[in-house]
Amino acid sequence: HLYHRRQRQMCIRDRGEQRGQSEAIARNLAVMSELKTPIIVVVTGEGGSGGALAISIGDHLSMLEYATYSVASPEACASIIWRTPDKAPEAANAMKVCSSELKKINVIDEVISEPVGGAHRDFDIVSANIKASLVNNLTILSKYSMDDLLERRYKRLIDIGA
């Protein structure tokens, strides 16, 4: 049973490689790092795996209060470290996937508040909060020269995890 699960995980990774996902993510990061426009990223639900890495290049990274963001799922991390996805809660805790934790360690810049229970409880409030964040941060970022924005973006990318 364990052998088949590992084989299935290996096949999923191999299929991803066959489709060129890692190369596509790398190309995305290279292109986004040179875009001459402010980039604001808002994680509204689950930002995970290669998709999380692909959007990490923004000039400002915000997350909704109850969103999660990581380059691997807690199940994948637990499978790698403890060889069982059953340890996903421990992995999630160690990975710091929640917005408040990621803000503390400077992976993200801002936590956008949500109603108790999540964004689906009041779309109007959450939409207004996201709009306010976007307007505020676009105003701030538009004061930088393009050279300064590109320099800050590059520094942000190389400082992740440092």
Q: Model features per residue range: what roles?
A:
Residues 72-162:
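Amphipathic alpha-helical segments at domain termini/boundaries
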Residues 38-41, 59-63, 79, 110-113:
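Well-ordered beta-strand positions
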Residues 6, 54-55, 102:
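Hydrophobic alpha-helical segments that mediate membrane insertion or helix-helix packing
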Residues 8, 58-59, 99, 108:
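Short, well-ordered alpha-helix to beta-strand connector turns
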Residues 28, 50-52, 56, 63-83:
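CoA-thioester-processing core
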Residues 13-38, 44-52, 56-59:
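Thiamine diphosphate
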Residues 42-46, 64, 87-93:
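Hydrophobic alpha-helical bundle architecture
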Residues 1-12:
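Single conserved hydrophobic/aromatic residue that forms the stacking wall/gate
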